[in-house]
UniProtKB/Swiss-Prot annotation:
UniProt entry keywords in alphabetical sequence: Flavoprotein, FMN, NAD, NADP, Oxidoreductase
InterPro entries given in the database record: Nitroreductase (IPR029479), Nitroreductase-like (IPR000415), Nitroreductase_HadB/RutE (IPR050461), RutE-like (IPR023936)
Domain of life of the source: Bacteria
GO function terms (MF aspect): oxidoreductase activity
Transmembrane parts of this sequence: none
Stated family: Belongs to the nitroreductase family. HadB/RutE subfamily.
Protein name as catalogued: Putative NADH dehydrogenase/NAD(P)H nitroreductase Reut_A1586
Amino acid sequence: MQTNELLDKIFRGARSQNGWLPTPVPDSKLRELYDLMKFGPTSVNCSPARLVFVRTEEGREKLRPALAPGNVEKTMAAPVVAIVGYDTRFYEQLPDLFPHNPAVKAWFEGDEKVDFANTTAFRNGTLQGGYLIAAARALGLDCGPMSGFNNQAIDQAFFAGTSIRSNFICGLGHGDPEKVFARSPRLSFEQACQLA
């Protein structure tokens, strides 16, 4: 694939989906997706993202009560819904993830460092969520990211008793081109950027 084709596939031609074709996404594709996105950089390789790939009827029914009314139909129709979460105790994995500096775990441990740890987890987990979308599109999947849901309800249903918190959800599969909205405008370089 040529560079421009790939950029179109991931960015210029890709669209947030509002409807889905009934084409299944195999578990092997979800593994391939994670095994690609995990290579995106994070601060001190902290890798705080934690994912739940909701793909069964039982999982969907756990998810349904947390969704905003306007998001129920399209979310329930997605072959897979990724819950993109972040682990606020990500630093427990740092001895394995950042082995050349064993002291780095201590940067985040302790009551006085909770805010720093939580901010780091949220920021880098969000970054990894962006990698998930880019990787999914590169692998030929469409995405429907959204934040129209009750985080506390998701956390209770899927992460109770853990240090993981939900950030956003993202439908994955093959989108229905008939249900894609017209592309909304984007800010120009001059509106969004400065050269310093």
